[in-house]
């Protein structure tokens, strides 16, 4: 009876010792799994973490690698996130371990006992040894977790930054694509042979202008105002004096030049104009220096730079030299600066203050602006009135053609005024001042100072208390301003189109009666207050009124050979309708 009692105490001690031994072995095995693999020191790029936390060569030729090795991307794709975000991963089977070269003994009774005790300690309730073998989880080492998280953060930053940079530079490229570029193509426009609008040679009526310039050689040298002289003094003191030689650098990527400054031409809206000559080639040109009596702003500088790129807005003719030849547009062929000079300088002359910009347009040479020319022929004596009327007819026909070129190129000038046209010595009429040029359909806030040459829709938008005050630039906008300029050519003033005016031929020409009927009717159609009903420039050249004016101009031009010699009698020219 005493044997069972005496035998029970030692057996309890044995079982307690065995339990402590099992717990110690478990702790030792878990601690071994936290050691840093020495293989990471060699090449982390060629390694991946297996589900058990072991290191497996990615480039192993083993046939079971796809089954046993889980890359970071594959794990994320199958689980919807990094496998490190899971509590654990499944262990490989003994047969798989043996195939990968890792020696793993078959599970013995003692090992099964250890696993059973381990799961019991963790609160596991799994019942079978096979289920425990497949479902066993192991804790991933801390350094492995940190490394994988750092890789994920680096990948997110890399892809996120590259995507954001792609969107940013894509937006920059899109803005740059919309901005006009100095694409100075050398080829002729594709429709050169079929488009009758293009200029190819002298046109009827140029001899009339040459005759007037011969009779009035000082027409381009009219007395300058006090403000013009003061502005020239400011430019001479701060930037470039008459007779001075300067080396200029191109803002458009063109070769540098050495220029000699000539006489002053006059003060134009963007700045001061004067003659210049290329010292190396002897090429004559007109230079325009940016000048303003108001404090210069960044917007003023940008406006000049945009005008230097305006030729890029044309649909077909994207070369300033070709635009000068085929369209008779005086677009700048270069935008230059004088190195070593400030971009903007404040200067004072004759008690007036102005700002001189170190930005210069280089343009083909001109002789006189149209507004000055019209003022001069308005002073002709009675006996020279037929010559003056023939010149007005020429200016009318050519102004319509020039604005039709704008429409044909898909652009809107936006600021057609009498001094937007100028004449060359050979009698050609040209259009200039493309600082406000935009593509048709753009929205622009029209300045209030051009009110009498602004169509009704532009005035209404500018005076509206609601909205941005912007006007949609259409071909009808330029057509209305064209009609106003033609009115000035014949009547020496802008038409009365203020509030309360009557839209009729009789009202407009009530104080200007000596105007041909075809001109009156054409102007009436061009300044129609209705945008939809207004006659456009391309339509105007097909009207009977315009055709009749062309015939009258051809007859008048036969009277002059261009050198001042009469080539016909008065009977060769039909009388202008009045």
Curated annotation (Swiss-Prot):
Compositionally biased region (Acidic residues): 569-578
Region called Disordered, residue ranges: 56-82, 559-578
Predominant localisation class: secreted
Post-translational modification summary for this protein: Phosphorylated on multiple serine and threonine residues in parasitic extracts and infected cells but not in extracellular parasites.
Domain Protein kinase: 259-546
Signal sequence, start to end: 1-33
Alphabetically ordered keywords of this record: Membrane, Phosphoprotein, Secreted, Signal
Keyword presence, Secreted: yes
Family matches, as PROSITE patterns: PROTEIN_KINASE_DOM
Top-level division of the source organism's lineage: Eukaryota
Biological process (GO), any one: symbiont entry into host
GO MF annotations, alphabetized: ATP binding
Protein name according to UniProt: Rhoptry protein 4
């Amino acid at each position: 009876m005493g044997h069972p009692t005496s035998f029970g105490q030692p057996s309890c001690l044995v079982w307690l010792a065995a339990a402590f031994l099992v717990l110690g072995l478990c702790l030792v095995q878990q601690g071994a799994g936290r050691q840093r693999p020495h293989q990471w020191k060699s090449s982390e790029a060629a390694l991946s973490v297996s589900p058990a936390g072991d290191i497996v060569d990615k480039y192993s030729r083993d046939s079971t690698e796809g089954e046993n090795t889980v890359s970071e991307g594959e794990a994320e794709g199958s689980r919807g996130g990094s496998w490190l975000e899971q509590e654990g991963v499944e262990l490989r089977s003994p047969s798989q371990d043996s195939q990968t070269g890792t020696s793993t003994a078959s599970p013995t009774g003692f090992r099964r006992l250890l696993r059973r005790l381990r799961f019991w300690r963790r609160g596991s309730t799994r019942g079978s040894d096979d289920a425990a073998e497949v479902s066993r989880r192991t804790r991933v080492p801390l350094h492995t977790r940190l490394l994988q998280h750092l890789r994920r953060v680096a990948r997110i930053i890399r892809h996120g930054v590259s995507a954001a940079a792609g969107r940013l530079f894509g937006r920059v490229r899109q803005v740059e694509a919309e901005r006009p570029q100095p694409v100075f193509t050398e080829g002729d426009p594709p429709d050169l042979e079929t488009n009758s609008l293009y200029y190819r040679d002298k046109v009827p009526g140029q001899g009339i202008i040459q005759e007037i310039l011969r009779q009035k050689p000082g027409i381009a040298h009219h007395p300058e105002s006090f403000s013009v002289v003061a502005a020239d003094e400011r430019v001479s003191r701060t930037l470039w004096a008459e007779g001075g030689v300067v080396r200029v650098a191109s803002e458009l990527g063109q070769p540098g030049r050495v220029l000699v400054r000539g006489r002053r031409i006059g003060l134009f809206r963007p700045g001061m104009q004067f003659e210049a000559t290329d010292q190396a080639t002897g090429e004559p040109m007109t230079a325009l220096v940016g000048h303003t009596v108001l404090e210069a702003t960044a917007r003023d500088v940008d406006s000049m730079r945009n005008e230097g790129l305006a030729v890029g807005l044309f649909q077909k003719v994207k070369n300033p030299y070709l635009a000068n030849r085929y369209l008779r547009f005086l677009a700048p062929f270069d935008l230059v600066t004088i190195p070593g000079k400030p971009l903007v300088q404040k200067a004072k002359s004759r008690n007036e203050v102005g700002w001189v910009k170190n930005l210069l347009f280089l343009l083909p040479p001109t002789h006189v602006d149209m507004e000055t020319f019209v003022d001069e022929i308005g002073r002709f004596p009675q006996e020279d009135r037929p010559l003056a009327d023939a010149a007005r007819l020429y200016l009318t026909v050519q102004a319509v053609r020039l604005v039709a070129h704008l429409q044909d190129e898909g652009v809107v000038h936006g600021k057609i005024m009498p001094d937007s046209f100028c004449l060359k010595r050979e009698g050609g009429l040209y259009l200039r001042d493309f600082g406000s040029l935009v593509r048709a359909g753009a929205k622009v806030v029209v300045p209030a100072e051009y009110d009498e040459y602004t169509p009704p829709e532009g005035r209404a938008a500018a005076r509206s208390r609601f909205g941005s005050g912007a006007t949609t630039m259409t071909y009808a906008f330029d057509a209305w301003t064209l009609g106003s300029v033609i009115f000035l050519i014949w009547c020496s003033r802008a038409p009365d189109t203020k509030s309360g005016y009557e839209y009729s031929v009789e009202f407009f020409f009530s104080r200007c009666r000596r105007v041909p009927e075809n001109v009156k009717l054409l102007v009436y159609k061009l300044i129609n207050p209705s945008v939809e009903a207004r006659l456009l420039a391309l339509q105007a050249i097909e009207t009977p009124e315009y055709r009749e004016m062309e015939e009258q101009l051809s007859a008048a031009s036969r009277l002059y050979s261009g050198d001042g010699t009469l080539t016909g009698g008065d009977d060769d020219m039909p009388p202008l309708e009045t």
